[in-house]
Every structure is written in structure tokens, then in C-alpha cells.
């Protein structure tokens, strides 16, 4: 029971991929050969790759860990070997206090350098994983901006008002229903991008990775909020137009 509750609190990469694939099918059926359908296809491939990468991210780099262990053992062994070569009794007998102090200072510096090298090797796996995740999160951020560009010229007021376009106006061939579905698809894709980013946060405790994931989630939330504002405007304008009474026939027309 407790194990099931634990899994219920974890995002399932397979379910997210299925949701993205279903959304791609919906967009392709509603808007075939559109730019948004192409973006949805690319997002599907990215979602599938993300699911595989997240699984690999949780696995240890065995070779790198063995190398780190060997480096640590070699560093400790080298320190012990050098220490055993020194006749400390003879050093204390012959050296003056200043010489002893200088010698101890050199030994401390060597130890600090050795520990710094060991720390570098031990954290190498974490830094490699962080670099890879940051690169993938940058890719998701780019997707979010591409989706925002697709909805940028979709103006609900222009669709309902029927105003005459200028020569530089973007093409507006969508009906009210199509525009509503288009904007809704954009909002769904942004939400799924946030979920894909959250998959990386679920596999690491790296503060930098978690901060980058939060940035992606904040970006998609802000862009999605703009889209939902357009959807609300579209709905409100449509309701206002529906409330306008139809013109009554004049006496000459009756």
C-alpha cells in the first residue's frame, strides 16, 4: 500500500510519452501539414528520448566510479608512501623550529591539493550528468519559445470582428472553433514540456538542475497564461456577440 502511494507521487515517463503521442495525433488530424503539427512531431521524438535519458540518468557510471575509487586509493597510497620514506625522528633531531614549520606547511599544502584532486574525481560523475541535463533543458526551453511563436499571431479579436486585413497582416483562415483548438493545443504542449523537464528533477538532487527545471516550468507557465488569456477573450467576445439581439424587421419589411 505504501509502495503504491510512493509510485503515485512519481511522474511516469511512459505515461507522459503516451500523452504527447496522443496530442500529436490530435493536432495532425485537426491541422494536417501545419507548422504546429511538425512541432508536435518533434516534441514527440524529444519526449521519447527524454524518457530513455531519464532512465539512464538514474544509473551510475560504473566505469567512472571505478576510476574515481582507484584515483582515491592511489592518492592515499602515495601520501602514505611519501610519509614512510621520511625519517621523522631524524627530522625532529636536526631541524630547527622554523624548518619544521616550513616542512609541515608544505605537507599540509600537499594534503590539501590531494584532497582537492580526490574531490574533483568524486564529483566528476555529478558534473557530467548536470552538463547533459542542462543541455536537454535548454532544448526544452527552445521548444517552448517555438510554440509561443506559433500562437503569437493568433488574434481572437481579429477572427470575431472580421476586420479587413492590411497587406502585411498574417493570414487568418481559422474559424473561431479552429482558433480555440489551436490555442488549446499550444497550451497543452507547453504543459507537457514542463512535465518533461520535471522528469529530470525527479532523478537528481542537484540544486543547479532543480533550479533550471524550475525556470523551464516558470517559462511554460507564463507562456501558457498568455494563451489562456486569448482563449478567455475568444470566449467572452463570442458570448457578447451572442447576447446582441438580432435586428427587428421594420414596418416596411413586414
Predicted regions and their residues:
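Non-transmembrane, amphipathic alpha-helical segments
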Residues: 4-8, 28-39, 55-66, 96-103, ...
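Generic structural signal for well-ordered, non-transmembrane alpha-helical segments
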Residues: 14, 21, 41-48, 134, ...
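Secondary-structure edge/capping motif, primarily at the C-terminal ends of alpha-helices
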Residues: 27-30, 50, 54-57, 147-154, ...
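Short, charged cytosolic
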Residues: 4-18, 23-50
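Solvent-exposed, non-transmembrane helices and loops of integral membrane proteins
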Residues: 131-176, 232
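Cytosol-/stroma-facing membrane-proximal "stalk/adaptor" domains immediately downstream
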Residues: 192-254
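Short, charged/polar, low-complexity loop and linker segments
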Residues: 22-26, 95, 115-124, 165-174, ...
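Alpha-helical transmembrane segments and their immediate juxtamembrane boundary regions
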Residues: 52-128
